[in-house]
Amino acid sequence: MYTGGMYLNDWRDTNYDRQHRPERPIPAQQISQKTVGLCAIAYFTLAVSISLLISTSATLWLCLLLTTIVAYDLQHKNNTYSPLLMAACRALLYPWVASLHSEALSAHILIAALGAFSYTLALSRIARTPSLFKQWPIPMGALITLPAILWLAYTKGQLSLNTIAASSGFALWCAYSLRGLYLGPLNASFTIKNLIAGFCAVD
């Protein structure tokens, strides 16, 4: 699904890339736009076919994820709602994978999906408007740290040293990543790269 989405994104951005990023594969004529589009369809078809072989309910979640990916890829330029679509793509991975393992949609799956949605939304908003964090530090900070907050709230009856250490480490990593928006000249790429790396902790 991820690879198909990347191909579809490049297919959709062909005209933009010809004007602004001529070094990209399609404008540079390393591959044709038609071939890229066919590759996207092939990857999506493969994902749906494999999911159908495993679980019908999983395929329903996959179709919802596919719809969201396509909506994002086709409308992400100059669309104020595209960060929400990106966040939804990330969140829908959890119920899809859970259903592949015949797991019910339990509280911990919903919490994981909500945490991923929140973190991805904050990251996408910062990537689009780096100054947004300075304008709205509390709401944006809450979005970024929500995965740790949800985890601590969900496990409050069985807190362990590992849980506290992991949550603290995640919070410190977020604070370190956000330095690019505050210290010295604006360095949004530093913040974005480090927040992307933080997805391993979110998961």
Show where each model-derived region lies:
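Membrane-embedded alpha-helical segments of multi-pass transporters/permeases
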Residues: V48-L52, L74, A175
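C-terminal membrane-associated helical module and adjoining short loops/tails
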Residues: A91-D203
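Alpha-helical transmembrane segments of multi-pass membrane proteins
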Residues: M1-N9, L65-D73, A116, T120, ...
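Helix-loop junctions at the membrane-solvent interface of multi-pass transporters
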Residues: L53-I54, L74-Q75, S99-L100, T155
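Acidic (Asp/Glu-rich) catalytic motifs at the cytosolic membrane interface
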Residues: M1-A28, T35, K77, L123-K134
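Short, amphipathic, aromatic/basic-enriched membrane-interface segments that mark the entry/exit
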Residues: I26-V36, L53-A58, H76-P83, S131-P137, ...
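Multi-pass membrane catalytic core of lipid/isoprenoid biosynthesis enzymes
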Residues: T14-I69, A87, L93, I109-L114, ...
